[in-house]
């Protein structure tokens, strides 16, 4: 027995030793790719020495003899910290993910190839001015210099993910950066999804008057009546099965509910306590680990600029110089139209146009798939744009037999100069120069908020399609592509883009809300990203005569829900007082406890409170009950509560209370009936998910920010090292916006919000502050992978200074790039 025991101990010891060696070896391999920030590197294609000074928050301050060398340094710094992120985004826009990830990403690649964004990016290089092209070339050379260093010094292939996904890394090219701007346009444009959803809902609803309830317009003057979609595309079934967008974390395709959002506001000097203009900006995008944002400072010949960049794109997209500050918010401009193209019944290679049938423009495209046979696609284009497969965006449900769907979209411009406009903005010294730079900007359309030392302004930038006043659906639903009135007629002049310059009140801002109320076709959009946050913002701005940097920070971090304050009195009007206290343990008693909590609640979506969870679960269950009857399976796609819909129903606007009656039941249900039943539904769900002690609930447990790694975030064990999860306040409709997932077992997970926050005070520009939601590094073993995450969660910031001495005071490291001598 003793012998057996000794052998078991030896085997166990051996296994432990092997495990330790394995873990140690894996750590050693992964850690090889951690960048050495205190380093001197000899590189090619550099005219003079470049210094990358990383301050104590690891923000690189890049100094060089000329702009070309500075952009070279930015490329090197991006590749040091975010190489895997950069090449993954490049593969995404190229439609080449399947070369690395196999069949799991084929569906994503198929659709990206249809858009053909990378080919358009290569073509767009010809439209760029020499200065922009030189900057892109220099940036690419900086990225490639880091790749050369990795190969020469065997630095763990540059990122730990490279050890798991064996694929060659092609040199960076200027077109890659242009393509990433187009990829951002894809992620921020949701009108294609919205058009198809409106068409499907129109087909499903027996009463077309109810379409204005479930898909309400933002408050403002109305529009002319539109035809039913069944009239535009006859012969379609009332209901069709949903084909969801690709669920892969790598998918760039977003529903309209999860397209871009953002906040930005500015104060003139006479509304600022310091006497200088103020600006705040927090762009909202999907959360990832690392965040898409990367902080950097570039010391250009025109002066220093500092702010948020996106690795792969050599531009400060939101930030400031010593003279100008700028922020971006999604404009929600209607820059996409879906067209139903009729095939020639005698020749499927042709489609109908206003002048007769015409052949598709076609070419083959081959998708290489890891561990599988390659796939050959035939890409087809019409005059209106690329033909998209019916298997995406539910296009099959709204496309009659003998037809195909095509998309026109401003981002499909083969002479896209958006990146040149962004570079010109970095050199602008005044608001007027900043506005002028936006004329070259194409997509994605944004509201550009600007301040200089004297002036504040907001300008919508990006191409706005010129539509015919006789357009059948006004761009709100797919329309026949062979009718001339439905086709785009070019681009509206830049002067037609909304502009607000030095408003009399001294305050301006945007929360993706409706900015103008103009009749079609000069309307900008019928769909807007916000009707709620703007109300709270207006209240905060008006309650003070003068503002400070800190009051702007308070507004960015505000968690009071205007929506909760307005909806709860409406839906609970007949439920608050229901007689005597019910016995403990009964559903009636649980309902009374919930209502008592909500009655004393201020509407603050604080992570430590139970009321936000009760409220959110209640209104979610309420919308489900209201629409399930009429929409059937389509109701699942309305996965975020629309406050305007709930309000219309409970105020019975134009007969909207009809949604409260269940069509399949004999009794006539009322809206208070629906509210009571929905509250019971919500409490049952809460009990099953979080327990029955309502007073002990925490909103933050359900509303965790999910910064998940896009490729390894679902891998057991690794996900605990890669993913960054944080309990957070806020919600769908608070200024501290934490957009919820809306579906699945954790519908209130915070998946979309402000990955970057910045507030700039031009009375003392170097007192400006900014922060991102994870950290600068994309390497999970780096201290700088998540060091900013807790600051971000607590509402704290780091200094945003152009003071060179401050950057050099306690640097993380200084990387010197030295030109190679022949």
Predicted segments with their positions:
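Second-shell loop/turn segments in exported
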Residues: 70-73, 111, 119-136, 406-408, ...
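Hydrophobic alpha-helical segments
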Residues: 388-389, 403, 441-544, 604-605, ...
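N-terminal Sec-pathway targeting helices
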Residues: 1-18
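Glycine- and hydrophobic-rich flexible loops that cap the catalytic core of alpha/beta enzyme folds
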Residues: 259, 300-315, 319-324, 328-481
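Gly/Pro-rich active-site capping loops and adjacent beta-alpha segments
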Residues: 64, 69-101, 327-378, 485-533, ...
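Charged, long alpha-helical assembly modules
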Residues: 617-700
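Substrate-recognition/specificity elements adjacent to catalytic centers across diverse enzyme folds
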Residues: 10, 23-278, 283, 289, ...
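Terminal end segments
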Residues: 523-587, 676-822
């Amino acid at each position: 027995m003793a012998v057996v025991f000794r052998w078991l101990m030896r085997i166990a010891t051996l296994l432990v030793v092997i495990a330790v060696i394995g873990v140690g070896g894996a750590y050693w391999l992964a850690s090889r790719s951690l960048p050495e920030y205190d380093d001197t590197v000899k590189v090619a294609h550099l005219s003079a020495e470049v210094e990358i000074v990383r301050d104590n928050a690891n923000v690189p301050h890049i100094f060089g003899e000329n702009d070309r060398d500075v952009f070279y340094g930015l490329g090197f710094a991006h590749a040091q910290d975010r190489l895997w992120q950069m090449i993954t985004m490049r593969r995404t826009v190229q439609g080449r993910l399947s070369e690395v990830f196999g069949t799991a990403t084929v569906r994503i690649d198929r659709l990206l190839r249809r858009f053909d964004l990378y080919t358009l990016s290569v073509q767009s290089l010809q439209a760029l001015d020499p200065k922009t092209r030189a900057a892109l070339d220099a940036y690419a050379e900086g990225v490639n210099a880091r790749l050369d260093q990795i190969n020469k010094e065997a630095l763990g292939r540059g990122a730990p993910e490279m050890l798991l996904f064996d694929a060659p890394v092609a040199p960076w090219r200027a077109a890659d950066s242009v393509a990433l701007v187009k990829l951002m346009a894809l992620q921020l444009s949701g009108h294609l999804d919205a058009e198809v959803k409106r068409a499907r809902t129109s087909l499903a609803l027996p009463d077309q008057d109810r379409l204005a309830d479930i898909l309400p317009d933002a408050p403002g003057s109305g529009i002319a009546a539109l035809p039913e979609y069944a009239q535009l595309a006859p012969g379609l079934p009332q209901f069709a099965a949903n084909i969801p967008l690709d669920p892969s974390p790598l998918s760039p395709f977003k529903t309209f509910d999860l397209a871009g959002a953002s906040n930005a506001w500015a104060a003139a000097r006479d509304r600022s306590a310091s006497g200088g203009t103020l600006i705040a900006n927090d762009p909202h995008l999907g959360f990832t680990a690392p965040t898409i944002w990367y902080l950097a400072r570039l010391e250009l010949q025109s002066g220093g600029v500092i702010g948020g960049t996106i690795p792969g794109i050599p531009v400060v997209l939101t930030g400031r110089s010593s003279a100008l500050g700028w922020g971006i918010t999604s404009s929600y401009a209607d820059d996409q139209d879906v067209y139903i193209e009729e095939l020639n019944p005698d020749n499927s290679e042709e489609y109908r146009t206003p002048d007769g049938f015409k052949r598709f423009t076609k070419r083959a495209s081959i998708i290489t798939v890891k561990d599988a046979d390659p796939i050959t696609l035939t890409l087809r284009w019409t005059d209106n744009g690329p033909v998209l497969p019916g298997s995406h965006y539910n296009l099959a449900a709204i496309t009659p037999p003998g037809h195909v769907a095509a998309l026109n979209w401003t981002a499909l411009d083969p002479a896209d100069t958006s990146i040149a406009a962004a570079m010109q903005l970095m050199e602008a010294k005044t608001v007027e120069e900043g506005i002028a730079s936006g004329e070259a900007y194409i997509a994605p359309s944004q509201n550009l908020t600007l301040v200089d030392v004297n002036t504040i302004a907001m300008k919508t930038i990006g191409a706005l399609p010129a539509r015919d006043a006789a357009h059948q659906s006004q761009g709100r639903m797919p329309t026949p592509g062979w009718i001339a009135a439905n086709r785009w007629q070019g681009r509206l002049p830049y002067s037609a883009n909304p502009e607000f310059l030095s408003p009399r009140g001294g305050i301006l801002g945007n929360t993706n809300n409706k900015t103008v109320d103009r009749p079609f076709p000069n309307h900008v959009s019928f769909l807007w990203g916000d009707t709620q946050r703007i109300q709270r913002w207006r209240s905060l701005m008006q309650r003070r005569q003068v503002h400070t940097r800190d009051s702007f920070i308070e507004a960015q971090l505000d968690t009071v829900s205007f929506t909760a304050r307005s909806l709860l009195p409406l839906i609970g009007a007949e439920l608050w007082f229901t007689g005597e206290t019910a016995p403990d343990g009964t559903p009636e008693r649980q309902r009374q406890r919930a209502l008592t909590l909500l009655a004393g609640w201020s509407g603050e979506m604080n992570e430590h409170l139970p009321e936000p969870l009760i409220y959110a679960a209640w209104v979610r269950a309420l919308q489900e009950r209201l629409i399930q009857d009429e929409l059937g399976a389509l109701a699942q796609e309305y996965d975020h509560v629309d406050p305007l819909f709930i309000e219309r129903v409970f105020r019975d606007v134009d007969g909207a209370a009809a949604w409260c009656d269940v069509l399949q039941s004999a009794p006539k249900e009322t809206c208070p009936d629906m509210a009571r039943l929905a509250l019971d539904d919500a409490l049952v769900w809460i009990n099953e998910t979080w327990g029955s002690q309502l007073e002990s609930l925490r909103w933050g447990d359900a509303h965790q920010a999910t910064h998940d790694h896009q490729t390894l975030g679902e891998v057991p064990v690794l996900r605990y090292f890669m993913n960054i999860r944080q309990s957070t306040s806020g919600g769908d409709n608070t200024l501290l916006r934490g957009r919820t997932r809306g579906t699945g077992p954790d519908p209130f997970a915070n998946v979309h919000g402000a990955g970057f926050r910045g507030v700039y005070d031009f009375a003392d520009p170097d007192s400006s502050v900014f922060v991102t939601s994870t950290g600068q590094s994309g390497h999970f073993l780096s201290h700088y992978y998540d060091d900013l995450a807790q600051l971000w969660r607590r509402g704290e910031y780091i200094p945003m200074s152009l003071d060179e001495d401050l950057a050099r005071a306690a640097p993380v490291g200084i990387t010197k790039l030295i030109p190679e001598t022949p």
